[in-house]
């Protein structure tokens, strides 16, 4: 069986899938670097929707700190988003 066959076997699978995707795109969370200078906002589909950078990090001499803060905030946001995506998927599956 492939994915399409499985979806045909589940009543309202398309409706459930569409609802899940809508919720994953709509719901957002944020993560901030330890130094508090970068905040990443991400939806549950793991798409970055906003990035807030403290102006002090835009100084060219702070490029290393900016990079480290971006990586930290983005990785934390992705990790949190992944967990929320799994929770939402589990919730949708229980509706079947």
Regions found by a protein language model. Give the residues of each.
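Extended aliphatic helical segments
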Residues: 16, 38-41, 52, 71, ...
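Long amphipathic alpha-helical segments used for membrane anchoring, targeting, substrate engagement
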Residues: 1-30, 79-96
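Short edge beta-strands and adjacent turn/loop segments
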Residues: 29-52
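Active-site- and interface-proximal helix/loop "cap" or "latch" segments in soluble metabolic
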Residues: 56-87
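Residue-level signal for functionally critical sites in structured catalytic/ligand-binding pockets
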Residues: 11-15, 19, 31, 44-45, ...
């Amino acid at each position: 069986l492939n994915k399409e066959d499985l979806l045909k076997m589940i009543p309202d699978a398309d409706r459930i899938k569409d609802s899940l995707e809508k919720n994953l795109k709509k719901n957002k969370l944020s993560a901030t670097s330890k130094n508090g200078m970068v905040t990443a906002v991400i939806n549950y589909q793991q798409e970055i929707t906003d990035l807030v950078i403290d102006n002090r990090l835009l100084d060219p001499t702070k490029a290393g700190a900016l990079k480290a803060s971006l990586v930290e905030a983005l990785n934390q946001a992705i990790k949190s988003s992944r967990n929320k995506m799994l929770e939402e998927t589990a919730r949708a599956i229980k509706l079947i």
